[in-house]
From Swiss-Prot:
GO terms for cellular component: cytosol. The lineage of its organism: Bacteria, Pseudomonadati, Aquificota, Aquificia, Aquificales. This is Phosphoglycerate kinase. Keywords: ATP-binding, Cytoplasm, Glycolysis, Kinase, Nucleotide-binding, Transferase. GO terms for biological process: gluconeogenesis; glycolytic process. InterPro entries: Phosphoglycerate_kinase (IPR001576), Phosphoglycerate_kinase_CS (IPR015911), Phosphoglycerate_kinase_N (IPR015824), Phosphoglycerate_kinase_sf (IPR036043).
Length: 395
């Protein structure tokens, strides 16, 4: 883990602390927040800053607006946060400008200010220097607590911490990196990885990097069919990336050379199309009919996955085992989620739809750590250094 300063290392009393959080939460057309997990995840950092008598200035993006758009306002977020911290949150009209400077200048210790959506300004994603300087001028200390954006070189996460010093980690970012280190750098063995999702192409670097770090790997989801095709078996109408068949063969060979036990599903639930009304069958992996496609792992594969989970001391999970958003193809993903949650192993999960699957399985509080980052979590699994962490102050 990078040896970076945290908020524990900084004198915060009376200081204006500019905190980059990730409040990019789903909001419906009526302005209701559908899932506030990311807001709750930032509360330990915010409460620590308040206890330290700091002035807390929060900044985040929300969605992908093209300029100012009221439906992407952070007002509902400020309202929800104030409920959790039992304190008024001052909602700023913008994130830069004279009004902002006045609000910040008049703020007192233990005030909480929420800046308006950073992405109302295109300069945020361009890492514009002038925009970054204006943001940096609002604070005296910079705190990064937005793991989900740490792979992006945007102004608020990459440029501002190079201008505003000291620049340190909040508790959420620290926790993300600590759990990653426990699972991937100094793990209790055996380490078992479960990888799912639709495409090998999106997980190729993850698979290659994890093969160097894990003892066993189980590939589920539609990704499995490219590997089955690489073994010269028919996959019916299942999703296959034909341009990656040779790569899939290489991965199987690499796993053998590294002594990693490499598992594919042994049976599937197949249907004629992706819908809850399609005729379905349970078939062995080498018997998928021509006019059917694999849409979930089958009961024998679920048992195999549970057996692997039972052998693990550490589990890393990324990606669903099937089309779990459909009632008839949910069992593989949800059963694996529940088995991981009930195991004695240290479990970390994240990226893509994994968190949605865990919520649907009703085990969000039983997995040791569910990452708040999608792309950032995948980049860590790929072995990449996250640029927005490297710019923070070393201890």
């Amino acid at each position: 883990m990078p040896n970076k300063k945290t908020i524990r290392d900084i004198d915060l009393k009376g200081k204006r602390v500019l905190v980059r959080v990730d409040f990019n939460v789903p909001i419906d057309n009526q302005g209701n927040i559908e899932d506030d997990a990311r807001i709750r995840a930032a509360i330990p950092t915010i409460e620590y800053l308040l206890d330290a008598k700091a002035i807390v200035i929060l900044m985040s993006h929300l969605g992908r607006p093209k300029g100012f758009d009221e439906k992407y306002s952070l007002k509902p977020v400020a309202k929800r946060l104030s409920r959790y911290i039992h304190k008024d949150v001052v909602m700023a009209p913008d994130c830069i400008g004279k009004d902002m400077e006045n609000i910040v200048k008049n703020a007192k210790s233990e005030d909480v200010i929420m800046l308006e959506n950073l992405r109302f300004h295109k300069e945020e994603e361009e890492c514009d220097e002038e925009f970054s300087k204006k943001l940096a001028s609002l604070g005296e200390v910079y705190v990064s607590d937005a793991f989900g954006t740490c792979h992006r070189k945007h102004a608020s996460v990459y440029c501002v911490p190079q201008i505003l010093k000291p620049a340190c980690m909040g508790f959420l970012l620290e926790k993300e990196l600590l759990y990653f280190e426990k699972a991937m750098v100094n793990p209790q063995r055996p380490v078992v990885a479960f990888l799912g999702g639709a495409k090998v192409s999106s997980k190729l670097n993850v698979i290659k990097n994890l093969l160097k770090r894990v003892d066993k790997m189980f590939i589920g989801g539609a990704m499995a069919f490219t590997f089955i095709k690489a073994m010269r078996y028919d996959t019916g109408k299942s999703l296959v990336e034909n341009d990656l068949i040779d790569v899939a063969k290489d991965i199987i060979d690499i796993s053998k050379k590294l002594g990693v036990k490499f598992y594919l599903p042994v049976d599937f639930i197949v249907g004629k199309e992706l819908s809850d009304n399609t005729p379905i069958k349970t078939v062995l992996w080498q018997e998928i009919p021509q006019d059917y496609m694999g849409l979930d792992i089958g009961p024998v594969s679920i048992s195999l996955a549970k057996e692997l989970i039972g052998t693990a001391q550490t589990i890393v999970w990324n990606g669903p085992m099937g089309a779990f958003e459909y009632e008839r193809f949910k069992d593989g993903t949800l059963e694996v989620a529940r088995a991981i949650a009930h195991s004695q192993a240290l479990s970390i999960a994240g990226g893509g739809d994994t968190d949605h699957a865990i919520i649907r399985a009703g085990v969000i509080n039983a997995i040791d750590f569910v990452s708040t980052g999608g792309g950032a979590f995948l980049e860590l699994l790929e072995g990449k250094e996250l640029p927005c962490i490297s710019v923070l102050d070393d201890k």
